[in-house]
Amino acid sequence: MARVYVGNLDPRVTARELEDEFRVFGVLRSVWVARKPPGFAFIDFDDRRDAQDAIRDIDGKNGWRVELSRNASSGRGGRDRYGSSESKCYECGETGHFARECRLRIGSGGLGSGRRRSRSRSRSRSPRYRRSPSYGRRSYSPAGRSPRRRSVSPARARSYSRSPQYNRGRDESPAYDNGYRRSRS
């Protein structure tokens, strides 16, 4: 079986019209025309050679773009349990297995036994990261201490402001009394 993609279709083209156009090249299994969004279709041929003949003759005709569909190597769209026919292992670059199953990774001690892995993981965890009882998330705090809380009075907090406050005049400032600077005593 071979699936052919037909693009740049007029939205008014019907499956029957496409079937009539492509049937002359060979036996069709199915014709599917997209409606939302319109403008493309898929046609399944029984024989790959018939599909290639149709592509050669119809591509460009009526402004259509006709090509072999990318995932048509098998009845399941060319996919297997590894995602797709082109999936490769991240470790060695070979197809047919995942990185966690790669013999290079396992052989070099990358995975090792599950027992050794879990022990080293628990040893490497920093004591500063503690499980928070709420939501099960980690929170950062120095070991042995809870986060420091500051209680700052509103007047004092105002004096630490980085940006100048323009709404306060000289006479209203707590450091000035009758327009003259008070000395701290």
UniProtKB/Swiss-Prot annotation:
**By its UniProt entry, which InterPro entries does this protein fall under?**
Nucleotide-bd_a/b_plait_sf (IPR012677), RBD_domain_sf (IPR035979), RRM_dom (IPR000504), SRSF (IPR050907), Znf_CCHC (IPR001878), Znf_CCHC_sf (IPR036875)
In what way is this protein post-translationally modified? Extensively phosphorylated on serine residues in the RS domain.
Bias class Basic residues marks the residues at 114-131
Segments for region (Disordered): 109-185
Offer one Pfam family short name for this entry: zf-CCHC
Recorded hits in SMART domains, A to Z, give: RRM (SM00360), ZnF_C2HC (SM00343)
Instruction: Indicate yes or no for the key word Nucleus.
Output: yes
Amino acid composition bias (Low complexity), ranges on this chain: 132-145, 152-163
* TM stretches of this protein: none
**CCHC-type Zn finger ranges:** 87-104
Gene3D superfamilies per record: 3.30.70.330, Zinc finger, CCHC-type
Q: Name its cellular compartments.
A: Nucleus
Q: Where do the RRM domain residues begin and end?
A: 2-73
The leader peptide range reads none
> Which family does the entry's similarity section mention?
Belongs to the splicing factor SR family.
Please give the name of this protein.
Answer: Serine/arginine-rich splicing factor RSZ21A
Provide the taxonomic classification.
Answer: Eukaryota, Viridiplantae, Streptophyta, Embryophyta, Tracheophyta
